[in-house]
């Protein structure tokens, strides 16, 4: 047997579910609370700082949210500037008064994380009637946040009441002597005829005298007199009729429908013309008219080329003015703002207004954005969120998502994409029904034989990538500028994806997920790399190496392009699953899967630059609490907490870390009570650390840490430190909870090629020892489990009422406890909770007693509690120099771990639950290797 040694240069390969002999060097079985960094190695994730317990008080205080208050909330993040970084949520409810938006500022004001004031517009809470988080979409556009209720059918705003055949304009086009001008007005079955005969000549004494010349006023005055007296026969005034002279015309109105005819002059009768609601040409209209008078200009060759015009008087009453294009009289004004997306507008620091989106609420109340100002249902249609059927009725659709691209705001509705005018974000109607411009709105549909309800969209250099449950599309323009004339939609790929979880982009890549089953299956993750215009994208199942690693309970996907990772989580679990890459510009040098276990069920995760914000829920029922936390993803902390003698600064690697709210000394029991600014979480293990450079009896206290006892008194919950009076340095006492850095290594095989891809799994290999290179700290442990060894075990029987079970054995690490019910492993946090001192298992639901169901006798639930026995190995650290009383941090250390077992006889974990950082950089193993006398070629 030959003595051999091999080195694993790094552990940046992440988790792999492949068999150990197929794993690449650097891949591991599991990496919990690890964070791969190309510079520092496989580091321990940063600790989460406690910011606030979420309450309903404004700006602070109030009642804590508990039970399931925020379980179905839609969470979002708003980054305005350095003073305004908000985390908010939408709590939908069918009862208007209970629907609400809550927003908290993550930038403290004098140490207080304030809740923003939300001012609601009239009836705006009615829009928040959807109950589930996936029923809402949120988009940030500058200083406003657009909120979309995906279940709200869009309606239209009806036009003002308008009756045709109620107006007529009689226009004198030529003044003739010795001529008859006649007007016939037919109301019901009665025709009223009014005539005026012009004089034969003038009585002027010379050519310069125009006093008695015949003009249009003479004709119009004569006709008007006749009309007002009921016609030539003078029967009396016609009820409901008015007649007004304006310029060279008479305008007649009546409260009932009527028809009108006119003729005048000696040849052809064209010296007097009449029009009511439409004309053939705009030249037929009077140059002076009543303000807002509307007439249709009819194109006899194409109805789509007809348009409407409205008179705009200079004095806004009547007289001289111009004819401008307008909307069909009585036509719908636009989309109802009450049923369209609303906006949350930032009005000041910690102040928002939730309102409808109306550009002209004075003239067009209730109309979303800009009203439809011109055209009709043929020449200027509504966007695709409302569909007009052949019988003229409207079918309401729902807006699934709002997006912003190329200076336009757009909507996704079923298989349609609607985009606003360029530069006019909420104007979805054309400026003119007569002509189309490149700035006009865009409305396109995806053509597919599959159901293609769009629910996601991402911009790329090649165009807009559209996502449906079964197919992906691209919306683009060959010349690069989207316009109604050039925009196209083409199919890209045919991958199934989860319609409730939006895709994300990570720099130049796009990621989306699909599920094999909504509960019992697992989650697949795909990566898409868009190519040039018209080219098929590259799509890769990036989660194949960890197949069935990510549960189907995932409810959200987020990304950090800055840090090149995506993160997935579900509200019923405390884990966040990550996929991180690192590229040198040509290829990905790192493709790494790992997960973080947070101190509560994860309801929200968002990364802003190098800061991660999270909302977690701890406890259940009335003791449940929602907490806002943050973590710094870099090795350089934002605040100075722990400092070594060399000036190295690190944040404590503990969750819920925060300064103790107060510190008091109990002289009777000789201990310090460090009070918590939050309720103690009994399911987590407490820890205290001292910050700064304070001294105690001449010894540097910075970096002092202890696992304290916990207690409560009239002041509140506290952690106690025995035999120390910490009141003099209360400002440096940080409280929090431990979390475990836990990396499970695969079996070691002798690798026969330089790249380490070929393993000799048939050989006999005995691993003598492993030498680990550990960075950033000197606090790390190693746990080993030998094959065939079991720990302490106890069994119990359910009685239908008892939830609490207390084994008689003890355990060093309660994470080693395994609980089974009827042979099935239970999930900690979901099915049960665990506490120490004494060891206690508390089920969420009491295990059932023996019972009879459908005449079948069923046995009582069998409970098995046992220790998954891991032995802590006593490693030896190579000799080194250190400064006495300094913080126990070292940039590089080597640990030698004795093994002396066959490679398939044990499992080894690298473990650390201390509040200090740690990084696994590399490992070399030594052992004896026998190729079983085979000659290999």
Task: Please place each PLM-identified region on the residue numbering.
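N-terminal beta-propeller domains
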Residues: 1-107, 290, 294-401, 405-454, ...
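Beta-sheet repeat architectures centered on beta-propellers
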Residues: 8-26, 30, 36-55, 79-81, ...
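Trp- and S/T/G-rich repeat-edge/linker motifs of beta-rich repeat architectures
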Residues: 43-68, 106-130, 157-162, 282, ...
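Structural signature of eukaryotic scaffold interfaces centered on beta-propeller domains
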Residues: 67-83, 130-141, 383-405, 446-461, ...
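Conserved beta-strand element within WD40/beta-propeller blades
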Residues: 87-92, 147, 410-411, 464-467, ...
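Loop/turn residues immediately N-terminal
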Residues: 94-101, 152-153, 408, 415-418, ...
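Long, charge-dense tracts
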Residues: 135-137, 144, 150, 157, ...
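Surface-exposed interaction regions enriched in Ser/Thr/Asp/Glu
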Residues: 260-268, 322-324, 330-337, 366-369, ...
């Amino acid at each position: 047997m030959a003595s051999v040694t091999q080195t694993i240069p790094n552990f940046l390969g992440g988790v792999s579910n492949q068999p150990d002999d197929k794993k690449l060097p650097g891949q591991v079985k599991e990496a919990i609370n690890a964070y791969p960094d190309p510079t520092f190695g496989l580091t321990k994730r940063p600790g989460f700082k406690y910011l606030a317990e979420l309450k309903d008080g404004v700006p602070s205080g109030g009642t804590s949210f508990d039970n399931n208050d925020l379980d179905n909330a839609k969470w979002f993040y708003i980054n305005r500037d350095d003073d305004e970084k908000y985390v908010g949520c939408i709590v939908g409810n069918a009862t208007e008064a209970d629907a609400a938006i809550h927003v908290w500022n993550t930038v403290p004001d004098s140490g207080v994380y304030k809740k923003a004031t939300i001012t609601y517009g009239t009836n705006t809470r009615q829009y928040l009637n959807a109950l589930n988080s996936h029923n809402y979409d949120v988009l940030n556009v500058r200083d406003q946040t657009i909120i979309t209720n995906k279940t709200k059918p869009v309606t239209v705003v009806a036009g003002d009441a308008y009756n045709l055949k109620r107006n007529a304009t009689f226009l004198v086009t030529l003044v003739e002597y010795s001529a008859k001008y006649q007007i016939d007005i037919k109301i019901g079955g009665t025709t009223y005829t009014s005539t005026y005969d012009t004089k034969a000549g003038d009585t002027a004494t010379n050519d310069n005298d125009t006093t008695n010349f015949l003009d249009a006023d003479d004709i119009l005055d004569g006709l008007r007199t006749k009309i007002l007296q009921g016609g030539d026969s003078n029967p009396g005034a016609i009820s409901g009729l008015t007649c007004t002279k304006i310029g060279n015309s008479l305008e007649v109105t009546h409260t009932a429908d009527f028809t009108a005819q006119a003729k005048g002059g000696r040849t052809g009768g064209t010296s007097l013309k009449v029009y009511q609601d439409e004309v053939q040409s705009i030249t037929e209209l009077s140059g002076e008219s009543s303000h807002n008078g509307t007439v249709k200009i009819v194109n006899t060759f194409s109805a789509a080329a007809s348009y409407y015009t409205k008179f705009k008087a200079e004095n806004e009453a009547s007289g001289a003015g111009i004819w401008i294009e307008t909307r069909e009289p009585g036509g719908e004004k636009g989309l109802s703002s009450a049923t369209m997306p609303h906006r949350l507008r930032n009005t000041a620091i910690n102040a928002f207004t939730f309102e409808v989106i109306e550009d002209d609420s004075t003239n067009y109340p209730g109309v979303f954005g800009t009203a439809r100002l011109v055209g009709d249902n043929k020449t200027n249609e509504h966007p695709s969120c409302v569909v007009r059927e052949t019988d003229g009725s409207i079918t309401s659709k729902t807006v699934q998502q709002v997006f912003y691209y190329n200076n336009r705001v757009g909507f996704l509705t079923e298989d349609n994409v609607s985009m606003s005018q360029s530069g006019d974000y909420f104007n979805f109607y054309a400026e003119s029904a007569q002509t189309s411009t490149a700035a006009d709105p865009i409305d396109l549909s995806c053509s597919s034989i599959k159901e293609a309800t769009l629910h996601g969209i991402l911009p790329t250099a090649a165009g807009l990538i559209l996502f449906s449950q079964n197919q992906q599309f691209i919306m683009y323009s060959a010349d690069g500028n989207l316009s109604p004339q050039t925009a196209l939609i083409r199919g890209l790929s045919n991958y199934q994806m989860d319609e409730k979880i939006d895709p994300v982009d990570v720099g130049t890549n796009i990621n989306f997920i699909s599920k094999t089953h909504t509960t019992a299956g697992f989650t697949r993750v795909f990566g898409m790399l868009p190519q040039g215009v018209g080219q098929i994208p590259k799509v890769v199942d990036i989660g194949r190496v960890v197949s069935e690693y990510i549960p189907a309970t995932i409810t959200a996907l987020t990304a950090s392009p800055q840090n090149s990772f995506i993160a997935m989580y579900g509200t019923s679990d405390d884990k966040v699953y990550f996929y991180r890459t690192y590229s040198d510009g040509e290829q990905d040098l790192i493709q790494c899967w790992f997960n973080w276990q947070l101190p509560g069920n994860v309801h929200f995760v968002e990364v802003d630059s190098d800061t991660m914000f999270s909302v977690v829920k701890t406890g259940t029922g009335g003791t449940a609490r929602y907490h806002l936390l943050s973590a710094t993803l870099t090795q350089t902390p934002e605040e100075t907490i722990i400092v070594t003698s060399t000036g190295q600064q690190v944040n404590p690697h503990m969750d819920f870390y925060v300064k103790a709210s107060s510190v008091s000394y109990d002289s009777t029991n000789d201990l310090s009570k460090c009070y918590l600014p939050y309720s103690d979480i009994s399911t987590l293990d407490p820890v205290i650390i001292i910050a700064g450079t304070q001294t105690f009896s001449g010894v540097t206290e910075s970096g002092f840490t202890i696992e304290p006892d916990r207690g409560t008194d009239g002041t509140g919950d506290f952690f106690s430190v025995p035999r120390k009076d910490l009141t003099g340095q209360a400002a440096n006492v940080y409280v929090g909870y431990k979390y475990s850095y836990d990396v499970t290594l695969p079996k070691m095989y002798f690798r026969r090629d330089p790249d380490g891809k070929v393993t000799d799994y048939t050989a006999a290999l005995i691993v003598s020892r492993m030498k680990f290179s550990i960075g950033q700290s000197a606090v790390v442990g190693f746990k080993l489990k030998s094959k065939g060894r079991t720990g302490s075990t106890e069994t119990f029987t359910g009685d239908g009422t008892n939830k609490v079970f207390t084994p008689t054995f003890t355990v060093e690490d309660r994470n080693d406890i395994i609980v089974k019910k009827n042979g099935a492993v239970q999930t900690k946090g979901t099915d049960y909770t665990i506490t120490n001192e004494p060891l206690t298992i508390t089920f969420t639901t009491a295990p059932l007693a023996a019972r009879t169901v459908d005449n079948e006798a069923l046995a009582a639930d069998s409970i098995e509690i046992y220790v998954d026995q891991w032995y802590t190995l006593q490693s030896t650290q190579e000799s080194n120099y250190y400064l006495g009383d300094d913080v126990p941090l070292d940039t590089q250390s080597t640990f030698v771990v004795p093994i002396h077992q066959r490679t398939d006889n044990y499992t080894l974990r690298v473990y650390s639950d201390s509040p200090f950082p740690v990084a696994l950089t590399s490992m070399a193993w030594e052992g004896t290797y026998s190729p079983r006398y085979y000659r290999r070629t």
